Amino acid sequence: SGDWKAIAAEVNDLGGALLPELLTPAEAAEIRGLYEQPGYFRAAINMGRHRFGEGEYRYFTTPYPEPVERLKQALYPRLLPIARDWAAKLDRPALWPDTLDEWLRMCHDAGQGKPTAILLRYRAGDWNALHRDLYGDLVFPLQVVINLNEPGADHRGGEFLLVEQRPRAQSRGTATLLPHCRGYVFTTRDRPVRSARGWSAAPVRHGVSVLRSGERHTLGLVFHDAP
């Protein structure tokens, strides 16, 4: 549930918006616990080694664990109207069908067959460099992150960062401390902003500020698959 009209308005204005609680604390703990079970993952990425920041994340393999699959299926139709509205404003083709399964079939037919849901783990001193999760030609323009830990109790720092490159202006940044079990929806690549010619695309990157203490796990839900 949630006021999706207000959520859409905030995403339109800022490129991101807090969502309601998407998991129970028990579900969040269950997903955190999967991190040490390699059978659930297809790859582990050391961010320091790749100069992505510091910390580690793991790509889930499919079939996804139940809460992950349920969330992706529930969120896709909620985000679809925003995606289609943005495509119309930016004069881009709105490729996305009505269901996530149909969209993922399109990705797979185009050679993008690897699952992209990730579980990230940050410890004291870890951070995530500003980036965009673009893997192939087919892109769904919105994605969701969920904090699986309790800020203040489990960790300090680790704010979610969005930086928007504004046309002919300085970049604009926002920092959000994600509440436990709440989601945050944000743009994957760019968002439409009003310009003299109507609408133009403002590129947006996301990252995570340095974790000052504790441990922070997040679930990242990207709605396109990877080559």
Predicted regions and their residues:
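A short glycine-rich, His/Asp/Glu-containing loop-to-beta-strand
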Residues: 17, 112-124
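A structural signal for short, well-ordered beta-strand segments
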Residues: 117-119, 144-146, 219-223
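Short, conserved beta-strand element in jelly-roll/cupin
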Residues: 121-124, 136-154
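Catalytic core of Fe(II)/2-oxoglutarate
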Residues: 140, 151, 155-227
